[in-house]
């Protein structure tokens, strides 16, 4: 079966969507006996077009000759707090996204919470499948203590401090303001934010956050956008991942932290419950976040329990299990839409 993977995610650095794209493509490429994969091929001679981003050039390539699969990494209702766009333009963009999703034959969601949102925009439930993100254990894994000490020197991170890591684009929805406030309230800990402005000046809150970065508390370090191949080092030098986002999808950063067996603290959002099984630290305010971090720092039993929860999540989203999931999915939907004479069934 020939699959054309279409995506522009890797053209913008520092996006979780790009990480998810690379993990999924690499996984399918390993199944050489079943699938022949190309990326952004201009040819139309494929059985499946698997579209990862909503670019117009990919939408226009959807047709009746092949199966069109749309990978949904966000829904319009969750598209607030990332980019600062005029209200009319934002409305037009959301309508465009809805029509693009409806044009696809099949939809894949990375979070089951999206399913009801997609049904609201008249996408049939029978054409929606939930397949979670995953992170390869070969790329993100615990390192030896001696290596971690050397890495802390490399990144100028104190060896004897409790290290709190935040990751992602600096924008309103990521809760960056709360991250900074929690850092101010805990001067005995060191806070690191790895990430920057992937979309430049159109990032929501760009001017405010540029100014904030110039006046960070003394116990906070900002690392600009880091290539993903070095992010395993960053996760290993930290003690806990802290993600105070107001809106999320299925964060690759959480899966990466889990692979390194680090506890993680998040805002108490409903969308985490079905995918993380409530095996995580949570809070809803600067005070609650601070209390959780203090407990993780001072209570070794609690810390180890939370680290075990991360191991559980890491093992659950297993590459080998998901390899079978993807193989079964492609075969199932292709057989669903095509008859024996290769004529596409219009449903």
Q: PLM ranges: what are they?
A:
Residues 158-174, 180-184, 192:
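Conserved donor-binding/catalytic core segment of Leloir-type glycosyltransferases
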Residues 277-288, 294-300:
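Conserved acidic donor-binding segment of nucleotide-sugar-dependent glycosyltransferases
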Residues 88-107, 210-213:
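Membrane-proximal helix-turn-helix segments that form the acceptor-binding/catalytic region
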